[in-house]
Amino acid sequence: MKIVIPGGSGQLGTILARELIAQDHQVIVLSRKPFLAPWPVVLWDAKNLGGWQASFDNADVVINLAGRSVNCRYNPENRSQILNSRVDATRVVGKAISNASTPPRVWLQASTATIYSHRFDSPNDDIRGVLGGNEPNVPDTWKFSIDVARAWEHAAEELDLPGTRRVLMRAAMTMSPEQDGVFAVLVGLVKRGLGGTNGDGAQYVSWIHDIDFVRSVFWLIDHDLSGPINLSSPNPLPNADFMRILRKAAKIPVGLPATRWMLELGAIFLKTETELILKSRRVVPSKLLASGFKFQFPTWEQAAEDLMTRWNSRQLTC
């Protein structure tokens, strides 16, 4: 297959492209900055149509991952960049698909599990899940993230594309032993003795192992699913359990807990937001499971053991 990955220069794009190439698919990555890779990299500005759109002709699949990182403080400038980078890129991808002489049969569009409400009572699935933003006393930063997710998905649905099946990938945190990812940050905290419970520890953590992320993307390409699809493990768990299991996998029995005020203060110094830690994301992938998808790493115990083994192996070879 010929597969185009706009915004594919980040961790997820690299993981996907590497596996696609290994399976003898043709991969083209669209990037705002040139970089060396084992696959063609085509420049685009993620906003306007240009010569890059020729790569869409005769493509089988487009996987749009473009969007500025949310690992920052949500000041006005960053908010504008977070929103516009997603909406602008998604709109222009839709236009390029519409203009293609032979449009791709599948458009996989990145979204986020953050779109769901902060809840503890029952999980949010992709059939009856409750979208967030209207909870009582919802923090402004949490509402902003949900508003971005809604606008992001809306941008993917603006055009009529009868020849292209669209999937909105509502992905949870993807855990990978690659450098600079969320797992690397968590392991760094654990190894410094700071991997204890965050806040009261009751908030749910939704996640997906990187191997299952890649497998689920392949599944979505090959199976007739459309609309919002949750890419997450079927077993989210409270933060206290999540961190305890990670410490066990890292063979570090103790981790200092962090209260909410400590996290808020730390987020200021680290130039990030506590929403990434304190919001309860209890998300399950009902549509994937109903379609027959089987997770290789359905539980955090299994995933954490594998990820730590791979992490330690990477450290030995670096």
Predicted regions and their residues:
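Conserved Rossmann-fold NAD(P)-dependent oxidoreductase catalytic core, especially the SDR/UDP-sugar
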Residues: R91-W142
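Alpha-helical substrate-binding/gating segment
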Residues: D160, V187-G196, A202-L237
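NAD(P)H-binding glycine-rich loop region in Rossmannoid oxidoreductase-like domains
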Residues: F35-V92
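N-terminal Rossmann NAD(P)H-binding glycine-rich loop of SDR-like oxidoreductase domains
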Residues: I3-Q23
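Active-site Tyr-X1-5-Lys
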Residues: P136-R166
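C-terminal amphipathic/interface module of NAD(P)-dependent oxidoreductases
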Residues: T274-C318
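Flexible, glycine-rich beta-alpha linker
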Residues: I115-S117, T164-A184
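Mid/C-terminal beta-alpha module of Rossmann-like enzyme folds, strongest
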Residues: K2, S216, L220-K271, E305-C318
